[in-house]
Amino acid sequence: MASIIQALPTEVVYLITAGEVIDSLASVVRELVENSLDAGATRIVVSLWPQQWRIRVADNGCGMNLDDLQQAATAHSTSKIRSSADLWKINSLGFRGEALHSLTTLADLEILSRPVDGKLGWRISYGNGGKVVQVEVTAIAPGTVVTVSNLFGNCSSRRQGLPTTAQQMKAVQATIYQIALCHPHVTWQIWQNDRQWFTISPARTTGQLLPQILPQVRQGDLQEVKLEIPNPPHSPLPCTNAIHRVSPHSALTLVVGLPDRCHRHRPDWVRVAINGRMVKTPELEQTILSAFHRTLPRDRYPICFLHLAISPDQINWNRNPAKTEIYLNEIIYWQEQITQAINQALSISSSNLKEAVHTTRVSKLLKAAEAKGGYNFNPQNPKEDRKNPNSLKAVAQVSNTYIVAEHPGGMWLVEQHIAHERVLYEQLCDDWQLVPVEPPIILYQLSLAQVSQLQRIGLDIESFGEQLWAVRNIPAPLQQRDDCAEAILELSWGGDLQTAQVAVACRSAIRNGTPMNQQEMQTLLDNWQRTRNPRTCPHGRPIYLSLEESALARFFRRNWVIGKSHGI
């Protein structure tokens, strides 16, 4: 009996492989652009003709000589790795050697290239399977131009199964945005149907680039942190970052939207990149969301971009052809480092203190004042207190609600209740203490669910008669309050321990409308500045408003042209 299991023909194997790598216009752009970045390009031009299923990517990278061009589209040919050991030393975006060969299976491929030190450029057209069908000399600047035409022309069903043109262009734009965030030093020009679609200008840092991609976010709404962190144990290889510079440590770049200024309705801007590539890592994304917990309003999500440049032996890229999913070693170690970096970014210190005119109304006032005056504004650096450049000095209390504080760089307005709430909440998170009460607090007509909830958060509660319950210990901050029974009843309505801690902090914090003397205000300010997340309360409300010296000078037109203020 003949065997029913047979080896697949080579062309069928190639079609299967091509389908794994190239599945859309966006995947073509991704593969070609990554080749450009691996070639050291600092300027990339992407041209698209979606109705013609045609894509062109031009770059100013190192280029290829004739021998490399003739080999470029051969199956599994690459300049990135040589042996299986190199799979643990990958410092490039590509390494499989599949993309160009897959394109010859699914489309018409043409490459023009000239090496930086070469005098001649070459144009090569490839046939099915990566065979060279035409070679000629061409005039071209150093770099490479790859043109893909008639994509999926031999697979009409593939075209029919793809989304609409508008959706595909949206996917292309998202792909380029993701890559640009990982490589902020690159200039991008994107054309569609011979018209310029959008551009991305280079920036020194990702934080400076992000407002080009998210126009609704201002530069002042972001905080960027760059850290060198030790490599985890058992990581002998040096770290290589996205632009191929060897470093003895791993590097962490973090850009966060300050929670008192910007956030999202969806978790669509929690992004993680590793060694120059955006990846899907649910464990790290959840770490980011957890670090922002109790800093944002309800049902809101952070803006956060994390880029790790780590030793390649910590990563296994060989998980799927698109390389968007990885196996990451020592993941608990990286989660700890990320949490610490986010806490540092959200803290208030002299290094990250910025002008923070939070409301649109205040901004409009400043602009109006500036527009009406014919003065010359030259911002001056205020003299800072070198002993404690970030100190706040309580000056006064307004409406028994807001503390006016003087800062070396300007003036702050702090709401006393939510500042105290943040202090108490972090104290409760660090040390959830239950203290005995005598006599016990008697509660009436609790349901079994309410009793179970109080027991879940650690309270000692027992039946004290028909429809009566005795609570014999309570959270420490509540023991001095007259409304302790009401607070315990509120805790019984559900939620986890953290929800209970928020409720206790809110109940125990000083109420708005309460007079405070100078020493009490100063103590509160000192304690609040030492919290881990001083920008918002546990419910996500902003705690303070800052008016920096430069903003005040603008509003009061303090820097006039000489003689202007005297009518000369």
UniProtKB/Swiss-Prot annotation:
Which Pfam families has this protein been placed in?
A: DNA_mis_repair, HATPase_c_3, MutL_C
Protein name in UniProt: DNA mismatch repair protein MutL
The Swiss-Prot or TrEMBL record describes its family as follows:
Belongs to the DNA mismatch repair MutL/HexB family.
Report the function annotation for this chain.
This protein is involved in the repair of mismatches in DNA. It is required for dam-dependent methyl-directed DNA mismatch repair. May act as a 'molecular matchmaker', a protein that promotes the formation of a stable complex between two or more DNA-binding proteins in an ATP-dependent manner without itself being part of a final effector complex.
One GO term in the molecular function aspect is: ATP-dependent DNA damage sensor activity
* GO cellular-component term (any): mismatch repair complex
List the NCBIfam families hit by this protein, alphabetically: mutl, PRK00095.2-1
Asked whether the keyword Mitochondrion is assigned, the reply is: no
Say if the entry is tagged with keyword Membrane: no
Keywords noted in UniProt: DNA damage, DNA repair
Gene name for this UniProt entry? mutL
Q: GO:BP terms for this protein?
A: mismatch repair
Q: Which residues form the signal peptide?
A: none
